[in-house]
Amino acid sequence: MSGQPMAGRDGARLESFLEMMSAERGAAANTLSSYEHDLADLREFLGRRGQSLTEAQTPDLSAYLTHLAAQGFAATSQARRLSSMRQFYRFLYSEGLRGDDPTGIIDAPRKGLALPKTMSVADVNRLLGLAAQEAATEGPGQLARIRMHLLLELLYATGMRVSELVSLPVKVLRQEGRFLMIRGKGNKDRMVLLSRAAIEAMEKYEAGRKALSQEKSKAAASQKKTDTAESPWLFPSNSKEGHLPRQVFARDLKDIAIRAGLTASAVSPHVLRHAFASHLLQNGADLRAVQELLGHSDISTTQIYTHVLEERLQELVQTHHPLAKQGKNLD
């Protein structure tokens, strides 16, 4: 760690951020002033928690937004503060000044207790379609594009938590059939079903990994290196955990959402998990079955999705209930 005092380092990086926004982004003076004010307020809040602006983690930033809400800030004002935070931490990440973006999985504040965000089937298809198209594009970075396509197919096909998704072991590539065993909260195992599209994406990703591994082995052999051990993770990374950080995936998901013409704030790993559950229920799935697939230990947790059933249940009652039929006969 640098010998520079924490307060001094925070100030220097904040100054560098503002200089970048001015020189490279052409931000107006009022915009720069807003960034400076927002981040100075965040810095003061973090200081009271014994945390620095540079090293703040997701829970620290979420606590700040909660603090703003408790102070009576409108959702729009909270969203502006979050936007300033996103710009700053993306700058730190892009400059290599920290290894992650702690704002990647923070959703924009919203008023009141809202129903779970979800996506329409059309929007999900749009997202998956673009991911497949980009994965098929040859050239530099193709394996990363294939990986992104697989991540999205797995997430929508299974409804996995993002923490479960990014930490899948590489041994899942050796599993046969359409079922996948995953380990969720409390180290509880559960079985999920893979779609045909997810299986095909996994096969393409496996082929890409093998090709890269062979290239690395050849390079190591030419340099007489022997350390070519394979990562135990399906989505390896140079992160502390060794696998793809969920914040990085969340950020990349918002980027591809924008390219697909969707609103970035309306798309996140958790929203895709909600879409998985909502679309199953809309098409007649049993709530208990969805509970098992999501890995909820309590049915009450799954019941937040019952709002999607209202229209379908009304139609079922009108079509199949004996009294409803009797009423039709009397007409």
Swiss-Prot record:
Q: Per its UniProt record, what HAMAP family does this chain match?
A: Recomb_XerC_XerD (MF_01808), Recomb_XerD (MF_01807)
Question: Which Pfam family is an annotated match for this chain, by its short name?
Answer: Phage_int_SAM_1
Q: Where is the Tyr recombinase domain?
A: 114-318
Q: In which broad location class does this protein mainly occur, judging by the first location in its UniProt entry?
A: cytoplasm
Keywords annotated in UniProt: Cell cycle, Cell division, Chromosome partition, Cytoplasm, DNA integration, DNA recombination, DNA-binding
Q: Segment Disordered: which positions?
A: 214-239
Bias (Basic and acidic residues): 214-228
Where's it found, cell-wise? Cytoplasm
Q: What does the subunit section of this Swiss-Prot or TrEMBL entry state?
A: Forms a cyclic heterotetrameric complex composed of two molecules of XerC and two molecules of XerD.
What name has this protein been given in UniProt? Tyrosine recombinase XerD
The UniProt entry, under NCBIfam families, shows: PRK00283.1 (NF001399)
Q: Which GO terms describe its cellular component?
A: cytoplasm
- Give the GO biological process terms: cell division; chromosome segregation; DNA transposition
Q: Which residues form the active site?
A: 161, 185, 270, 273, 296, 305
A GO term for molecular function:
DNA binding
Q: Where does the Core-binding (CB) domain start and stop, copy by copy?
A: 8-93
Its family remark reads: Belongs to the 'phage' integrase family. XerD subfamily.
**Which InterPro entries does the UniProt entry name for this protein?**
CB (IPR044068), DNA_brk_join_enz (IPR011010), Integrase-like_cat_sf (IPR013762), Integrase_catalytic (IPR002104), Integrase_recombinase_N (IPR010998), Integrase_SAM-like_N (IPR004107), Recomb_XerD (IPR011932), Tyrosine_recombinase_XerC/XerD (IPR023009)
| Purpose of the protein | Site-specific tyrosine recombinase, which acts by catalyzing the cutting and rejoining of the recombining DNA molecules. The XerC-XerD complex is essential to convert dimers of the bacterial chromosome into monomers to permit their segregation at cell division. It also contributes to the segregational stability of plasmids.
